[in-house]
Amino acid sequence: MSGRGAGGFPLPPLSPGGGAVAAALGAPPPPAGPGMLPGPALRGPGPAGGVGGPGAAAFRPMGPAGPAAQYQRPGMSPGSRMPMAGLQVGPPAGSPFGTAAPLRPGMPPTMMDPFRKRLLVPQAQPPMPAQRRGLKRRKMADKVLPQRIRELVPESQAYMDLLAFERKLDQTIARKRMEIQEAIKKPLTQKRKLRIYISNTFSPSKAEGDTAGTTGTPGGTPAGDKVASWELRVEGKLLDDPSKQKRKFSSFFKSLVIELDKELYGPDNHLVEWHRMPTTQETDGFQVKRPGDLNVKCTLLLMLDHQPPQYKLDPRLARLLGVHTQTRAAIMQALWLYIKHNQLQDGHEREYINCNRYFRQIFSCGRLRFSEIPMKLAGLLQHPDPIVINHVISVDPNDQKKTACYDIDVEVDDPLKAQMSNFLASTTNQQEIASLDVKIHETIESINQLKTQRDFMLSFSTDPQDFIQEWLRSQRRDLKIITDVIGNPEEERRAAFYHQPWAQEAVGRHIFAKVQQRRQELEQVLGIRLT
């Protein structure tokens, strides 16, 4: 006989064997109702030639029956259908599988089974390729071989020893790197000796065409004669400088002032000044040329260029702290040590300083806040004293000692500072280490994959039957997760679960799917289209 399935498409005629399948499942025939096809006792041979025998089972009604007449598989939502594996035909008439639309007009809308509701967790956006590579690197961050591999390959212990040594080495390098970063923030200087050379040359006056030359005075020189003049040179260099790069002499100073005799050169022409500007170009020395044939007393005022800047303390505060000229940070540190040593910090209000008699004389107050100290200290700081050198410019041709040398202390950058900066800025070693880490991670991942394959093959060779059964069970669980058909494993393991009415429909659908599959295969082989 022929009938219709739950989806509204025609079912194939049942053969006597098909009835035997339904009877074997133990499904009793449903009671007759509206829209139900007559049983075998009420019908004869159908037009399709199918014969309904005693073993043939009738299908449930497909007409507009009430909700009570619909059989529902446990664990499936109303209106949902069983997926049929291998069914490649077009969608049957009616609603598609898995939709919430009613199967027939007039049927109530389907609702999801509350036991199968799941929390809809919003999925994150798929990572970009760069982010995906970063996640992969983070997943492979553990370079330790698993214990099972170490037991399988005893030689891998050498790799683990190297890994432990590398971890200690990385910790040591990281600690030293942090120490270098902290040290490079502070001024790293060395005290060196700078030797200053002060020399002068004298050019006597000469008449035109006269090779002998005569000495004259500025007032009595003829108009055509060459005026007598002298030239003063100030140069210098570092003593025992190990660096190959020579530093310019002017780079040590902020300003240089040469004060000549005011009685000889007047109040407007007796000063020669040089001050550092942002656009100043460094030079190896200074030279001054003036007319004159008399000895000149001059004073050189050299202001050192301290980096960071240094300041001279008020004499009262300098005697109290024992600091004469220092940087602002060093002065603040010395001041705090004095406050801490003399217990001047207020015991209750810690942000206040109780001034002793010396502080009251210097800061002119009996109590001040910590935040007020920099402002109070600014009025007590002065520019450091310049280096004063007195020199006599000699114009006597018989005086052989015309060069004077003076040694002064200067601060220069520690050569280690440049090396530390280059070490921190260098990325060559880091790139090489990163590339080697990637290779190690890839090797460890390959070893883990090979170990998994070995376990797979070893389990199969040990007990093929149990292995295949366990593998099928695992694949079955994965298939349920992929197809979103979870069901109830506890019910499915019992025989009564398969004696329910929905099993008849499942068998019919399976047979129909197989028939359609065979039909397509036959059409492909014969190259015809059966109608």
Curated annotation (Swiss-Prot):
One GO MF term: transcription coregulator activity
- Family of this protein: Belongs to the SMARCD family.
* Sequence positions bearing Phosphothreonine: T217
- The ranges of region (Disordered) come to 205-227
Q: Where is this cross-link: Glycyl lysine isopeptide (Lys-Gly) (interchain with G-Cter in SUMO2)?
A: K226
This protein's major location comes to: nucleus
According to the UniProt record, list the residues that bear Phosphoserine. Answer: S203
- Where are the coiled-coil regions? none
| Classification via InterPro entries | SMARCD2_SWIB_dom (IPR030090), SWIB_domain (IPR019835), SWIB_MDM2_dom_sf (IPR036885), SWIB_MDM2_domain (IPR003121)
Where in the numbering of this chain does the SWIB/MDM2 domain appear? 306-383
Quaternary structure, per UniProt, is: Component of the multiprotein chromatin-remodeling complexes SWI/SNF: SWI/SNF-A (BAF), SWI/SNF-B (PBAF) and related complexes. The canonical complex contains a catalytic subunit (either SMARCA4/BRG1/BAF190A or SMARCA2/BRM/BAF190B), and at least SMARCE1, ACTL6A/BAF53, SMARCC1/BAF155, SMARCC2/BAF170, and SMARCB1/SNF5/BAF47. Other subunits specific to each of the complexes may also be present permitting several possible combinations developmentally and tissue specific.
Q: What's in the keyword line of the UniProt record?
A: Chromatin regulator, Isopeptide bond, Methylation, Nucleus, Phosphoprotein, Transcription, Transcription regulation, Ubl conjugation
Task: Give the species.
Answer: Bos taurus (Bovine)
Q: Which residues carry this modification: Asymmetric dimethylarginine?
A: R81, R104
- Name of the protein described by the UniProt record: SWI/SNF-related matrix-associated actin-dependent regulator of chromatin subfamily D member 2
Q: Tell me where in or outside the cell this protein is found.
A: Nucleus
According to its UniProt entry, what is the function of this protein? Involved in transcriptional activation and repression of select genes by chromatin remodeling (alteration of DNA-nucleosome topology). Component of SWI/SNF chromatin remodeling complexes that carry out key enzymatic activities, changing chromatin structure by altering DNA-histone contacts within a nucleosome in an ATP-dependent manner. Critical regulator of myeloid differentiation, controlling granulocytopoiesis and the expression of genes involved in neutrophil granule formation.
CC per GO annotation:
nucleoplasm; nucleus; SWI/SNF complex
One GO term of the biological process aspect: chromatin organization
Q: Where is the signal peptide?
A: none
PTM section of the record: Ubiquitinated through a signaling process involving RAC1 and the RING finger protein UNKL.
